[in-house]
């Protein structure tokens, strides 16, 4: 239930809010796609933590690049 709600909120952000701003994500996949994938793969708690950590790294001083969601087998959240 909570997972479905969170995924819906992220999708609503992508449809309603994201188009109002110019594209600025430094990463591939984008931060919103990363959040969707992270919650889908890791669940609400860990997926949200991974997404928040990614969003905090999405700024002009970080080089960005390809940064996929880690595999569930990787025990720790890493940068």
Swiss-Prot record:
Claim: rRNA processing is one of the keywords in the record? no
Q: Where in the cell is it found?
A: Cell inner membrane
- The answer, when asked if Cell inner membrane is one of the entry's keywords, is yes
Q: Per the record, a Pfam family?
A: YidD
Which cysteines are disulphide-bonded? none
Q: Tell me what topology the record assigns in the membrane.
A: Peripheral membrane protein
- InterPro entries, A to Z: Membr_insert_effic_factor_YidD (IPR002696)
SMART domains in the record, alphabetically?
Haemolytic
GO cellular component terms, semicolon-separated: plasma membrane
| Alphabetical UniProt keywords | Cell inner membrane, Cell membrane, Membrane
Q: Function of this protein?
A: Could be involved in insertion of integral membrane proteins into the membrane.
Report the family membership: Belongs to the UPF0161 family.
Name of this protein: Putative membrane protein insertion efficiency factor
């Amino acid at each position: 239930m909570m997972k479905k709600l969170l995924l819906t909120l992220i999708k609503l952000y992508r449809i309603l809010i994201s188009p109002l701003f110019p594209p600025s994500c430094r990463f591939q996949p984008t931060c919103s796609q990363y959040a969707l994938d992270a919650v889908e793969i890791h669940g609400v708690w860990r997926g949200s933590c991974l997404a928040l950590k990614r969003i905090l790294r999405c700024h002009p001083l970080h080089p960005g690049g390809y940064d996929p969601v880690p595999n569930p087998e990787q025990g720790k959240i890493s940068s």
